[in-house]
Amino acid sequence: MKGSRPEQAVLTRDTDMSKTDDTRAVIEGMVDGLNDHRIGDIGEFFSENFRWMGNQGCGQKIGLREFQDNWQRPFQAAFSDKVCIDEARLYMGEWAAAFGRQEATHSGEFLGIKATGKRIEIRYMDFWKVVDGKIVDNWVWTCSTVKAGKPMTAATALPQHLNKRG
């Protein structure tokens, strides 16, 4: 690289690799909990003040209650039979990442879109930081399709996706 190199990977610089198994247990339990459609007691896996950082259309939720009330409950109501399928997971100390898909029937209104009854697939990537057995940060990126070389986020791809699938 020409010139001075910007500092890289600051958040993972002091990762404690001895915490990898604990992180794995938290993430596996959380995904099972989401697939069991748990909402009220999902705090078993999330810090009370955790940050959920979604991409365009999803926004940012600060704290467990905001996540539950402004994302998890509306999403679950709109996709009542949804299941998360992580296709790959990576664990490194307090950090974990996954990519995969959610499969569901669009059974209720979501992001202003009336229920269509259609099956959908939402692709995602998640990155988590776990501290003291709880998720404190969750970065999320979702994409249902690619059009004209540009990723389409949940806010723009979901309406198109709901109109295409049968």
Q: Which stretches of residues belong to each language-model region?
A:
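A short, hydrophobic/aromatic-rich structural module that often spans a beta strand
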Residues: 104, 141-164
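Short beta-strand edge/turn micro-motifs at domain boundaries
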Residues: 4, 121-151
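Short, low-complexity N-terminal intrinsically disordered segments enriched in polar/charged residues
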Residues: 2-48, 156-166
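A short, structured loop/turn motif at beta-sheet edges
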Residues: 89-97, 129-136
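Short, structured motif recognition centered on aromatic/hydrophobic residues
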Residues: 23-27, 52, 75, 125-128, ...
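Exposed beta-sheet edge and beta->alpha loop/turn motif
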Residues: 101-131
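A structural feature that tracks compact, well-ordered secondary-structure segments
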Residues: 29-34, 70, 87-88, 129, ...
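A solvent-exposed, acidic/Ser-Thr-rich amphipathic alpha-helical stretch
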Residues: 21, 40-94, 101-103
